[in-house]
Amino acid sequence: MADQRMDISSTISDFMSPGPTDLLSGSLSTSGVDCNRKRKGSATDYQESMDTDKDDPHGRLEYAEHQGRIKNAREAHSQIEKRRRDKMNSFIDELASLVPTCNAMSRKLDKLTVLRMAVQHMKTLRGATNPYTEANYKPTSLSDDELKHLILRAADGFLFVVGCDRGKILFVSESVFKILNYSQNDLIGQSLFDYLHPKDIAKVKEQLSSSDTAPRERLIDAKTGLPVKTDITPGPSRLCSGARRSFFCRMKCNRPSVKVEDKDFASTCSKKKADRKSFCTIHSTGYLKSWPPTKMGLDEDSEPDNEGCNLSCLVAIGRLHSHMVPQPVNGEIRVKSMEYVSRHAIDGKFVFVDQRATAILAYLPQELLGTSCYEYFHQDDIGHLAECHRQVLQTREKITTNCYKFKIKDGSFITLRSRWFSFMNPWTKEVEYIVSTNTVVLANVLEGGDPTFPQLTASPHSMDSMLPSGEGGPKRTHPTVPGIPGGTRAGAGKIGRMIAEEIMEIHRIRGSSPSSCGSSPLNITSTPPPDASSPGGKKILNGGTPDIPSAGLLPGQAQETPGYPYSDSSSILGENPHIGIDMIDNDQGSSSPSNDEAAMAVIMSLLEADAGLGGPVDFSDLPWPL
């Protein structure tokens, strides 16, 4: 055991001795030098091989080819991207040319704006709420011809197709004969404008040629966030395919001419009545449609479109428009009354008519414009309506008329009740027009009465007082004019003009008075009663004011003779109360142009004396005794 321990210790000491350590370190250093030598040799060999490749023409050629392939690949990629961008830009430009809202812009839009406008346009055409396709709009069991006949039977009209460029009738259904009494062959190929009323041609041209270029909403630019300007650039307009159209027009009816018994009578009224007989009101409803020229089967000699676009046409159904006359209702159900709004000049002529009047009166708005409302009033109601006309021109309050009869297009009468009020220009203080809200009165309302509408006392003789003695009177008989239905008064259109001139004259005279300078010319009211010392109210003392016959008063309240509106002594005479007019005789015989001029001269002298501009007043020129 002791020997074994000694062997182990000697072995450990031999291992820990410095001799072997130096040997190990020497071997490690020798191996590191060998490695460095090997690394230096490999790097040198690689550099030499590279130099050899560069010096070799074949290697240099391969290097150049490698670099060229990389460059060509980059150029090919850029060319592909450029062609793709160019193609996309061309499609965007073509899409912008097809969208009407993009055509309306004065500058080039960005791509996002064009795409957004295109989406909005597609939603407008197809309908965002109820989209449908052509495959499910009709049952599969029905053919196109059967569907067309069913639609025409349900609509009780005729189908027609009109070219938008010239108004040429390209197609019309056979059912047009039931309405216009023209055959299908008579109308196809003809111009639609030849069968329209002259006053409706402009309206129909507007429906055919108007392109929806103006955007209906404010568009925002995607880049700037600012509203896009909608300046329409001049140029050929593009029709919007799918745009709906609905309008009224009068078309000729192929009816036999009615013989007039009195051939010598050739008045304007009879001609207008004959024109009305030969036209009927058609309500056209449809949409614009575009077809390629190859599908239309057009003549080869027809002129091609300048831009090579599709042929735009109006596809519509025309229905005979019949006015809606309310029928009496026997139940207790109360519905909203039918009414329409009209605007009149101060002489009673129509300047605006609501479209609802067509359903009530059967007149188109353009038929009523420029005509006097008195031409349609029943002759028994003209007196009361003339009084209301005077009142509405003199007051700012609303005037409600009694029930009166208004002549409709077929010659019959319907019962209306109107509310009138005048609009006064705030700058000129003059009445510009009269607004009338006309309500249809049913028969049961007339029998039971309606307490919601105040009643005015009618004046049966005021209608005759409106006309001169040579043209009308209380005992004058109303002649029947050929061509004009009974119930209306011939020459009634001048009544409104006479009332307007009368009110304007009163405004002019009152406007010349200093006391009325600060007040509106519409505030014409009756003056205070005359002094007790003036018998009968005909003689005014100390520069008093004679009573003015108010145009809105009833015959029992109106004065017998007209007078001039003078101001009282405190306003006209001022500090000279000793100057006055003792009496003014207002007899009928003393009213003449010379007397009126003399009276006005005296009034002007009084005004000058009051202002200190003139001398003493000479009353010798007065036609009345002082």
Swiss-Prot record:
Segments of this protein annotated with the region Disordered: 1-58, 459-492, 511-595
PROSITE patterns named among the record's database cross-references: BHLH (PS50888), PAS (PS50112)
Cross-link Glycyl lysine isopeptide (Lys-Gly) (interchain with G-Cter in SUMO2), sequence positions: K259
Domain PAS, residue spans: 143-215, 326-396
Residues the record marks as site: Important for interaction with CLOCK: L125
Motif (Nuclear export signal 1): 142-152
Protein name: Basic helix-loop-helix ARNT-like protein 1
Native source organism of the sequence: Rattus norvegicus
Lineage: Eukaryota, Metazoa, Chordata, Craniata, Vertebrata
Record gene name: Bmal1
